[in-house]
């Protein structure tokens, strides 16, 4: 009997020791391997090579994914050309040299080539515009030039579009949003005349664009004010201006009209006057009823310092 009691006591001590052991009381930990290395090769999906763009679009639509349509196109304008074709090269100083000199002979030969090309272009223009002549067109071109600049000073963009091409319009109005332009035509020093006519084909055969270069020598007044009313450039005194203005028309268009297309600036032309920019200087804030001259600025005198050597 005593032996059995000892045996039960020993078994109970062993069971209690096994339950209270630190290895038994520790929480179970699950160790999982983590991939830290970047995979530079991703195996392709099964059957990805056999899929076409149409199959992928159909699959996306079936899944309810709507992909926006991307158009790789940009609008173009065919009412006018993108530049001046075969621009006229004015002689230096706009003076005729003697035909006996080497430079004068070269200038005369160049003029004959340009005249022959202009005569061929005039024939093409008259096929679509029977009223076109080199005698009456310069006066019409000068009227377009004067009216377009009047609309520019008033910034009437709707009427300005009818007199200038889509290529010339941004060049005329760029930077004039906060400026005031005062322009006037005084008089013509010389009668305007046609110096060159070109009528090339563009894009397709038979699609003709006519460009006529008109020489204008007149007196103008131009003065530009900034948004604060200060003069940026120009003056109210009339000045002699020599310009070569290009007018263009889409001959195939039955409703096309002659419009100003651009200007040719000779390489020997004098540089333009620099524009005086307005800057804001830090200073005392003025009231609406005060002027800058009414304020007395206190001049800070230098503080004397003692130098010890």
Curated annotation (Swiss-Prot):
Chief location: mitochondrion
Native organism: Xenopus laevis (African clawed frog)
Family indicated by similarity: Belongs to the mitochondrion-specific ribosomal protein mL45 family.
Family annotation (InterPro entries): mtLSU_mL45, NTF2-like_dom_sf, Tim44-like_dom
Gene Ontology biological-process annotations: mitochondrial translation
Taxonomy of the source species: Eukaryota, Metazoa, Chordata, Craniata, Vertebrata
The protein's name: Large ribosomal subunit protein mL45
Record keywords: Mitochondrion, Ribonucleoprotein, Ribosomal protein, Transit peptide
Function according to Swiss-Prot or TrEMBL: Component of the mitochondrial large ribosomal subunit (mt-LSU). Within the mitochondrial ribosomes, required to direct the nascent polypeptide toward the tunnel exit and position the exit at a distance from the membrane surface.
GO molecular function: structural constituent of ribosome
Domain of life assignment: Eukaryota
Database matches in Gene3D superfamilies: 3.10.450.240
Location within or outside the cell: Mitochondrion
């Amino acid at each position: 009997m005593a032996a059995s009691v000892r045996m039960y006591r020993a078994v109970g001590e062993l069971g209690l020791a096994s339950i209270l052991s630190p290895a038994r009381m520790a929480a179970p930990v699950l160790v999982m391997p983590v991939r830290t290395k970047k995979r530079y090769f991703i195996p392709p999906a099964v059957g990805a090579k056999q899929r076409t763009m149409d199959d992928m679009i159909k699959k996306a639509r079936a899944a309810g994914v709507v992909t926006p349509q991307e158009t790789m196109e940009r609008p173009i304008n065919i009412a006018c050309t993108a530049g001046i074709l075969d621009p006229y090269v004015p002689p230096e100083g706009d003076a005729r040299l003697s035909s006996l000199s080497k430079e004068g002979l070269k200038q005369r030969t160049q003029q004959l080539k340009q005249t022959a090309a202009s005569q061929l272009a005039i024939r093409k223009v008259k096929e679509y515009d029977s009223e076109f002549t080199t005698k009456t067109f310069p006066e019409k071109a000068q009227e377009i030039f004067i009216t377009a600049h009047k609309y520019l000073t008033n910034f009437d963009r709707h009427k300005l579009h009818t007199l200038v091409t889509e290529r010339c319009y941004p060049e005329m109005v760029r930077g004039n949003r906060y400026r005031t332009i005062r322009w006037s035509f005084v008089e013509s020093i010389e009668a305007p005349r046609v110096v060159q006519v070109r009528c090339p084909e563009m894009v397709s055969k038979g699609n003709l664009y006519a460009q006529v270069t008109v020489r204008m020598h007149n007196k103008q007044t131009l003065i530009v004010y900034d948004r604060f009313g200060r003069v940026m450039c120009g003056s109210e005194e009339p000045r002699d201006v020599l310009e070569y203005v290009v007018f263009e028309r889409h001959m195939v268009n039955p409703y096309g009209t002659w419009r100003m297309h651009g200007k040719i600036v000779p390489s020997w032309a004098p540089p333009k006057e620099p524009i005086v920019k307005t800057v804001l200087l830090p200073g005392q804030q003025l009231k609406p009823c005060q002027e800058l001259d009414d304020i007395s600025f206190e001049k800070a005198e230098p503080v004397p310092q003692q130098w010890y050597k």
